[in-house]
């Protein structure tokens, strides 16, 4: 059996860094959509949560509230929300719970094939849970960068 401890170490690192950054964000700041952006910080956080559940566990295994798809799926934006977004505290708690749950559910399955390969057009295809896990870490890092850009734009507009 292959040793995937490095993947779990990276997951711990990435999620830990993300949760630490979340403590610097206020509820007010989380809802600002600066000029030139379509989403806010709260959307990016919810999107990370929803996407990781969906990509690793599929629609049947997701633990996010059902209404999160209408709020945080690709192509959605806060301007279209029909209800108030979850608090940062709630999102942080869900991210912590997800971290534990995914490690428990996939600990010994990273070499297992996904039910169906996940294709990113001509950019590549994920075939295993391990490949998808690594992709979700890239995705989380990408949205961490988006949040940094949003915070910079918010600070510049003050």
Question: Residue spans of the language-model regions?
Answer:
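Short, small-residue-rich loop/turn micro-motifs
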Residues: 22, 72, 110
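Acidic/histidine-rich alpha-helical segments that form the ligand environment
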Residues: 78-116, 131-136
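Short, contiguous alpha-helical
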Residues: 8-12, 19, 29-76, 117-158
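Generic serine detector
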Residues: 5, 16, 87, 108, ...
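Short, charged, low-complexity loops and linkers
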Residues: 1-7, 81-82
């Amino acid at each position: 059996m292959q040793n995937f401890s490095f993947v779990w170490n990276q997951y711990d690192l990435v999620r830990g860094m993300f949760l630490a950054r979340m403590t610097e964000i206020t509820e007010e700041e989380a809802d600002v959509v600066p000029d030139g952006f379509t989403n806010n910080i709260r959307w990016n956080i919810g999107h990370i949560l929803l996407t990781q559940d969906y990509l690793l566990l599929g629609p049947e295994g997701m633990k996010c509230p059902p209404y999160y798809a209408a709020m945080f799926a690709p192509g959605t934006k806060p301007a279209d929300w029909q209800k108030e977004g979850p608090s940062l505290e709630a999102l942080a708690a869900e991210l912590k719970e997800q971290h534990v749950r995914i490690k428990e559910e996939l600990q010994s399955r990273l070499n297992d094939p996904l039910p169906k390969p996940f294709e990113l057009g001509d950019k590549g295809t994920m075939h295993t849970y391990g490949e998808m896990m690594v992709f979700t870490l890239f995705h989380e890092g990408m949205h961490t960068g988006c949040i940094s850009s949003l915070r910079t734009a918010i600070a510049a507009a003050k």
